[in-house]
Amino acid sequence: MEFLVKSVRPETLKTATLVLAVGEGRKLGASAKAVDDATGGAISAVLKRGDLAGKVGQTLLLQSLPNLKAERVLLVGAGKERELGDRQYRKLASAVLSTLKGLAGADAALALGDLAVKGRGAHAKARLLVETLADGLYVFDRYKSQKAEPLKLKKLTLLADKADSAAVEQGSKEAQAIANGMALTRDLGNLPPNVCHPTFLGEQAKGLAKEFKSLKVEVLDEKKLRELGMGSFLAVAQGSDQPPRLIILQYNGAKKDQAPHVLVGKGITFDTGGISLKPGLGMDEMKFDMCGAASVFGTFRAVLELQLPINLVGLLACAENMPSGGATRPGDIVTTMSGQTVEILNTDAEGRLVLCDALTYAERFKPQSVIDIATLTGACIVALGSNTSGLMGNNEALVRQLLKAGEFADDRAWQLPLFDEYQEQLDSPFADIANIGGPKAGTITAGCFLSRFAKKYHWAHLDIAGTAWISGGKDKGATGRPVPLLTQYLLERAK
């Protein structure tokens, strides 16, 4: 889809479909009022008949209005004045896209810039709008015999006042990069586990480096992981025929002496639970257990498209967790790269076992910040549901920056505590630390475990177990989160 920004009067624009917003109580914004005047009150007449109440997301298509160059006018409800928030604005945008998909026109122009969205300026409104539209175009039909019909709609133009055009252009540019990153994240998450395994992800990283010459990629194999002393990482993979991989992405958009930000992604390409086997019902969704790594891929794609002036490192800890005669057993003790020993009480708490060695590896980059992203605990879904990611960290400034980024990007997180009292739940009589802390506060104790390996830098942990994918039903699939949050965090660091 091509997105353009133009500063023209809506009533003079030649387009297949002109989109205008109408509020409840027949409220017309400046754009809708200008078109209404040009058509001799045609819009007002329709509204007086009660054909459109103006509730958020309601639509009404008008054909061949007089004195317009637009072939059609699509009216969309914007709700009550001064009550339009981010979610309602996204709902409005989705309703517009749904209608446009069913039309024959190859282009459309959206005159929505005069809508007041609470707490949002021209840049943020454009970003929300374009991101919603672009993400709404996503289709995954790679394995369908009958593909989705090609979309007739090819071009969307955002109409903006001249004073706002630069801000709208920038918002649209950022949104397209974020949406492309989300699409990559969703593609990788939606792939079946017989295709998307650690070696495959290494190949995908090299493919991304071919597309973007500013990206450097290194893939560490099992032999190298053993040389590095990553006993915890290797323990997760030893039950599978698929060898593990640590994928290293490096982008240098700033001076070489500027410390990088590091993103660490959990990449369990299929999680059976290992010897601590999961129930069979719903196990197919454990292909999404690599969505942390997929979100690092997606964030890198967005950063590479935007060519942000930052240095960024990605560490993707990729393995498959399978039961076999050679698999790790409950009760096994392993030595991590840090030298700390871990008693593995539950092989289904494997994400933290690959992440802890990756977090130790991150030390060599002397980072400004390290953020790990993982579908780590079912307890996070119990605590926060599927709307909000869990967030913990050892530096309050970093945590606040991520919370702020999530609010701006409409990809929110919520902070959970890392009090010392929770650390006691991880005590082991046989090793330095146990890999689980009992049934209480499971998300927090998982964060506490990781914190033991992140003491040499500012670190935060995002638990995306509830937000990385939609479970079951017709909308089942990866969401692309938290690419918007992470990209916004990095955009702020690039300023």
UniProtKB/Swiss-Prot annotation:
Cofactor: Mn(2+)
Cofactor note: Binds 2 manganese ions per subunit.
E.C. number(s) listed in UniProt: 3.4.11.1, 3.4.11.10
Biological process, per Gene Ontology: proteolysis
Keyword line: Aminopeptidase, Cytoplasm, Hydrolase, Manganese, Metal-binding, Protease
Reaction(s) the record says it catalyses: Release of an N-terminal amino acid, Xaa-|-Yaa-, in which Xaa is preferably Leu, but may be other amino acids including Pro although not Arg or Lys, and Yaa may be Pro. Amino acid amides and methyl esters are also readily hydrolyzed, but rates on arylamides are exceedingly low; Release of an N-terminal amino acid, preferentially leucine, but not glutamic or aspartic acids
Annotated positions binding Mn(2+) 1: D271, D348, E350
Pfam families assigned to the protein according to its UniProt record, in alphabetical order: Peptidase_M17 (PF00883), Peptidase_M17_N (PF02789)
Cellular location(s): Cytoplasm
GO terms, molecular function: manganese ion binding; metalloaminopeptidase activity
Amino acids binding Mn(2+) 2: K266, D271, D289, E350
Gene3D superfamilies on file: Leucine Aminopeptidase, subunit E, domain 1 (3.40.220.10), Zn peptidases (3.40.630.10)
Positions annotated as active site in the UniProt record: K278, R352
GO cellular component, one term: cytoplasm
Keyword Hydrolase assigned: yes
Function in brief: Presumably involved in the processing and regular turnover of intracellular proteins. Catalyzes the removal of unsubstituted N-terminal amino acids from various peptides.
NCBIfam families cross-referenced by the UniProt entry: PRK00913.1-2, PRK00913.1-4, PRK00913.2-4
UniProt similarity note: Belongs to the peptidase M17 family.
Name under which the protein is recorded: Probable cytosol aminopeptidase
Gene (UniProt): pepA
